[in-house]
Amino acid sequence: MTKLTLYPGTFDPITNGHLDLIKRSAAMFEHIIVAVAASPSKNTLFTLDERVQLVQEVTQDLPNVSVEGFSGLMVDFARQKQANLLVRGLRTTMDFEYEFGLTSMYRKLMPELESVFLTPSEEYAFLSSTIVREVALHGGSVEAFVPSVVNQALIHKVKSPV
């Protein structure tokens, strides 16, 4: 059975860790939709459209990866796309506990949606969008942690916040 796979997240911004997970997933699964969540409850630095555009730019060389923004419940988006597999990254035991709770809820809301968890490559185990944003907002360099187009977008956003 062909699996349509979702990799959901806020991606504010997308990091090298996210990109590593996308590339590894693209090598394992037929098609990946990177599902960029609107996340209205989060105070995002980039708009949904900006985040979708950045993810599209950094994944354009991956032919079996597409990028879409969505709002509302992730399971509703998965159902709309007829996805039956969800990829999530796990860095820490805190991530595991959070994801375990989400997976339990997803099973109740959409039993046919399976979850696959990937651990990060060692060099990205500490990396998060929150840390990247904080460092950038305080004037630190994040070029080692994000693709260059994202680094430039962060520099621009921090210098002229909207």
Swiss-Prot record:
Keywords: ATP-binding, Coenzyme A biosynthesis, Cytoplasm, Magnesium, Nucleotide-binding, Nucleotidyltransferase, Transferase. Substrate binds at residues 10, 42, 74, 88. The record marks 18 as: Transition state stabilizer. ATP binds at residues 10-11, 18, 89-91, 99, 124-130. PANTHER family: PHOSPHOPANTETHEINE ADENYLYLTRANSFERASE (PTHR21342:SF1). Belongs to the bacterial CoaD family. This is Phosphopantetheine adenylyltransferase. It comes from Aliivibrio salmonicida (strain LFI1238) (Vibrio salmonicida (strain LFI1238)).
